[in-house]
Amino acid sequence: MPLVDPVTMSSSAIVKGAVAQSTSTTKSTPGSQATESSTTTAGSSSSLATLRPVQIKQTPAAQTVRHALPAALTALYLLRFDALVTNPVPVMLNALPVVAAFQMTYALLCLPAAGEPASKSNRKPRPGEKKKGGDIGSSTIITALLASVLTSIVTPFLYFAMVLFGAPFLTHGSHTFLCAAHLALLTLFPLFYVHGVDSAAWAAVGGFRAPLDETFGGLVGGIVGAWLGAVPIPLDWDREWQRWPVTILCGAYGGYLLGRVLGGTLFWGKKF
């Protein structure tokens, strides 16, 4: 006859069974948690692994714009450099729509829009096959407009980031804001057009884990160039071009063009 516990009025065999069951449940819990965590980690790793470098469209117009745009931006900056040194605010303000038109043309003709399959954007028509809708459709135009809106929204945050890194706050506010607008238009607009609001893609971009291409290379080059452009400002050279933010803007444009060219050619597909 099994012994009965006078307090719980249950047999010792039942108590031992309950204890053994709870122990086995406790032991199995860490394993299940480890399985869930490993599944989550594998899912995030797979999402990063599927992020591929952006391929430029292979149409003749895309290849022409791809190579002509860096020369056009360089010519624009060199032609307006003296005026930029003399009066930076109106020069940056007047150049902003021109740069926006350049970037919009580059995105529409050269880059695949967010959500567009890469195979569809890069597929060449077969002999005798007519391409439907042309290269630019209503969806790509809407994507470009949304990318412009997102770039405008991010510009104030980029302005405050520049202030945190030492930009003038009480003075030269318009100078800094227009410089931030140029930097956002150069580096962030193509990324918004390509990736949209994909959280996994932006996590890879923000963590510098994305593969290098023209869009991500332009971002890295623009940031590094703007940072290096701040070096000559405090130096005692007494040059007119040391005014804020001439060297910052010069470094941003030069770094963006260099990073974009290298990211699209020599370092395409590589990671940090």
Swiss-Prot record:
The chain crosses the membrane at residues 91-111, 145-165, 177-197, 215-235, 248-268. Pathway: Glycolipid biosynthesis; glycosylphosphatidylinositol-anchor biosynthesis. GO terms for molecular function: mannose-ethanolamine phosphotransferase activity. GO terms for cellular component: endoplasmic reticulum membrane. Signal peptide: none annotated. It is found in: Endoplasmic reticulum membrane. Disulfide bonds: none annotated. Keywords: Endoplasmic reticulum, GPI-anchor biosynthesis, Membrane, Transmembrane, Transmembrane helix. GO terms for biological process: GPI anchor biosynthetic process. This is Glycosylphosphatidylinositol anchor biosynthesis protein 11. The lineage of its organism: Eukaryota, Fungi, Dikarya, Ascomycota, Pezizomycotina.
